[in-house]
């Protein structure tokens, strides 16, 4: 269950009342943002990585929004986790305290090199320890106590976010991206194209959809 809060409890109660076992395929149950017909998902992923390689933060709004409190790549702000200043840059955009770190999204097949214990956590529900390489090279996604709240993306995940991570890894040798929710502190998530336009104009952050 990708929503450990009250909304998840209500869904669980509804499932119990329904009386049948539900197969949970993914956490994307919200509003759908239609992808532009002028480019393929691969072209979109390549454009996003090119933007990130310029040391810029960007938003992504793909397909259906996530159900639950975690941004899992369909309504996310993403950035390079390696730069020592990136945490401050994203916190400034989101109007959060500077000390607060962000979550990592990692290609599942490389997670064991960066996090321990090595857990499969596609819904960002586990806090684990960063390995030595993480503590030394990925300061933007590590808490003060050396832990990280991780999202793993498996090789069977046919999402644009997986493509972004694969291309990012190919270009940088780093299979990890900083991932946080596509909203500003105290405001709702970007949900549709109109929200994305407003976000871009107000906060000067490119949103890809």
Residue ranges and their predicted role:
Residues 1-209:
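Flexible beta->alpha loop and helix N-cap segments adjacent to enzyme active/binding sites
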């Amino acid at each position: 269950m990708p929503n450990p809060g009250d909304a998840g409890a209500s869904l669980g109660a509804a499932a119990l009342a329904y009386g049948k076992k539900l197969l949970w395929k993914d956490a994307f149950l919200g509003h759908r943002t239609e992808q532009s017909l002028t480019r393929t998902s691969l072209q979109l992923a390549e454009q996003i990585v090119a933007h990130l390689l310029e040391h810029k933060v960007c938003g992504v709004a793909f397909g259906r929004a996530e159900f639950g409190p975690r941004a899992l790549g369909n309504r996310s702000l993403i950035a390079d986790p390696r730069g020592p200043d990136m945490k401050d840059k994203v916190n400034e955009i989101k109007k959060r305290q500077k000390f607060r770190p962000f979550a990592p999204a990692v290609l599942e097949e490389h997670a064991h090199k960066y996090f321990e214990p090595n857990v499969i956590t596609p819904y960002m529900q586990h806090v684990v320890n960063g390995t030595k390489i993480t503590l030394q090279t990925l300061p933007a996604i590590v808490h003060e106590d050396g832990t990280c709240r991780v999202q793993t993306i498996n090789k069977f995940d046919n999402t644009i976010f997986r493509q972004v991570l694969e291309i990012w890894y190919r270009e940088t040798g780093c299979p990890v991206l900083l991932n946080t929710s596509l909203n500003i502190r105290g405001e709702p998530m970007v949900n549709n194209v109109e929200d994305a336009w407003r976000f871009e104009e107000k906060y000067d952050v490119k949103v890809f959809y």
